[in-house]
């Protein structure tokens, strides 16, 4: 049943109907549409459109419909209704007859869909927050178990300075904490109800919109009807949150793909999150991580697409805005799936400590320590930097690490170097010296783990 047929003398072309209809994706808003309709029925009682008995009948029928939808949401797709609003109204009329036709009084699909989508977004944000914190917790637990796993840290994918696997885990905890904060901020701006704004100019009935917002669990009602039905900032914000969050997960995946490679060999992934080759029997491929990395692109595309859709739209509602849902649903589904999968990857990961430490001892990752040693002896840092560079060239020529160079060879580059340099060049010394807040020293890493556990209530 179309909700707008009286103005037209010809039926819609079937090709246009298929092009125009949105039920195939907005059926996901069924629960929110029904909940919003229950609240609207209560509001209509306050302005005399419905009697208390009529409202009771409508609410009972809507609650039955809600249970039917929860039991089998796919039933909705068997209908040829234009959208979820048409489907809900049609099913309501099936249940209560002519009374069902009174429910839409004073309401437009413009404020209705805006309300439905905000309700759905609020629920989905809470799911994302839960999954985000679960992944943070998994990273903290992995960090706690690997505080003594020394490995090389990289810049430009070249070994740079020694770190620990725990410190690496905690870097991603920080990224995820920012993602969590962004979602919390978005949730605050989501928490205003557009219901009662009508098509664009507000409703003609003196409904208490603040009360109506409270019935739906919103903190307040929106302030401007024209903005309320035009606004899709929350869609852009959530897509932006997802895009940033997926960049973090993609970097996490890329790091672990490299760590798991034969060239690095720092970790072993569980069989539960890897697959094999149809030709090469020895292969164990990090498919879960590669898919996380690959899915990042589709989320970025959803954000870009929505920004382009909205950029030239006049106020208020335009059918272009129907394009908000598919990209949003897919992006947030993808982000949620990837958060869960990243946590699963960490469950069963094995850190190969000897291989990590061997790699950290190569590549002259302790060169900065030698420069700092020279600074402590009174050599200006820029000069110390040059001296150490020359010492590294000599070590490479001899095929030795810095700490294996004889003292006489080191003193060719600076006479201030003494026997006390060798303890300074050990990996543990490199870590211990990074004791300022946020550093990689064992004390700082342990403190960071404790702080994260307290914040996450672990």
From Swiss-Prot:
Keyword presence, Cytoplasm: yes
One Gene Ontology CC term in the entry: cytosol
Name of this chain's protein: Argininosuccinate lyase
Subcellular compartments: Cytoplasm
Keyword annotations of the record: Amino-acid biosynthesis, Arginine biosynthesis, Cytoplasm, Lyase
Main location (coarse class): cytoplasm
EC number of this enzyme: 4.3.2.1
Annotated pathway: Amino-acid biosynthesis; L-arginine biosynthesis; L-arginine from L-ornithine and carbamoyl phosphate: step 3/3
InterPro entries the UniProt entry points to: Arg_succ_lyase_C, Argininosuccinate_lyase, Fumarase/histidase_N, Fumarate_lyase_CS, Fumarate_lyase_fam, Fumarate_lyase_N, L-Aspartase-like
GO biological process: arginine biosynthetic process via ornithine; L-arginine biosynthetic process
Pfam families: ASL_C2 (PF14698), Lyase_1 (PF00206)
Major enzyme class: lyase
Family: Belongs to the lyase 1 family. Argininosuccinate lyase subfamily.
Domain of life: Bacteria
Catalyzed reactions per annotation: 2-(N(omega)-L-arginino)succinate = fumarate + L-arginine
Coiled-coil region(s): none
GO terms, molecular function: argininosuccinate lyase activity
């Amino acid at each position: 049943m179309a909700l707008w047929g009286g103005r037209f003398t010809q039926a819609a072309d079937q090709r246009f109907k298929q092009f125009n209809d949105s039920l195939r994706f907005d059926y996901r808003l069924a629960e929110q549409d029904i909940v919003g309709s229950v609240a609207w029925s209560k509001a209509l009682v306050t302005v005399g459109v419905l009697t208390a008995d009529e409202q009771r009948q409508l609410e009972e029928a809507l609650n039955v419909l809600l249970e039917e939808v929860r039991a089998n949401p796919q039933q909705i797709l068997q209908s040829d209704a234009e959208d979820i609003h048409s489907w809900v109204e049609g099913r309501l009329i099936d249940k209560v007859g002519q009374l069902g036709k009174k429910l839409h009084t004073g309401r437009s699909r413009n404020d209705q869909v805006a309300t439905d989508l905000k309700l759905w977004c609020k629920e989905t944000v809470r799911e994302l927050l839960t999954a985000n914190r679960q992944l943070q917790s998994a990273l903290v637990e992995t960090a706690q178990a690997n505080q003594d796993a020394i490995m090389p840290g990289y810049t430009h994918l070249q070994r740079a300075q020694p770190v620990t696997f725990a410190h690496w885990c905690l870097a991603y905890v920080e990224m995820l904490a920012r993602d969590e904060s962004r979602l919390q901020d978005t949730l605050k701006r989501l928490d205003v109800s557009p219901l009662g704004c009508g098509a664009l100019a507000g409703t003609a009935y003196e409904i208490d919109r603040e009360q109506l917002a409270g019935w739906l669990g919103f903190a307040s009602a929106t302030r401007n009807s024209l903005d309320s039905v035009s606004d899709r900032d929350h869609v852009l914000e959530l897509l932006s949150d997802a895009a940033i969050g997926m960049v973090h997960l993609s970097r996490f995946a890329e790091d672990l793909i490299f760590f798991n490679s034969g060239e690095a060999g720092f970790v072993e992934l569980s069989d539960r999150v890897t697959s094999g080759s149809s030709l090469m029997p020895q292969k164990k491929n990090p498919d879960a991580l590669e898919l996380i990395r690959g899915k990042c692109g589709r989320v970025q595309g959803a954000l870009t697409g929505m920004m382009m859709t909205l950029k030239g739209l006049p106020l208020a509602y335009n059918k272009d805005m129907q394009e908000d849902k598919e990209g949003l649903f897919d992006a947030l589904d993808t982000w949620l799936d990837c958060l869960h999968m990243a946590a699963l990857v960490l469950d069963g990961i094995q850190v190969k400590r000897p291989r990590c430490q061997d790699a950290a001892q190569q590549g002259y990752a302790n060169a900065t320590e030698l420069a700092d040693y020279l600074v402590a002896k009174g050599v200006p840092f820029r000069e110390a930097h040059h001296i150490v560079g020359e010492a590294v060239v000599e070590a490479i020529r001899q095929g030795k690490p810095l700490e294996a160079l004889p003292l006489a060879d080191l003193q060719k580059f600076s006479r201030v170097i003494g026997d006390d340099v060798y303890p300074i060049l050990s990996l543990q010394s490199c870590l211990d010296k990074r004791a300022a807040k946020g550093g990689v020293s064992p004390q700082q890493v342990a403190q960071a783990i404790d702080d994260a556990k307290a914040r996450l209530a672990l």
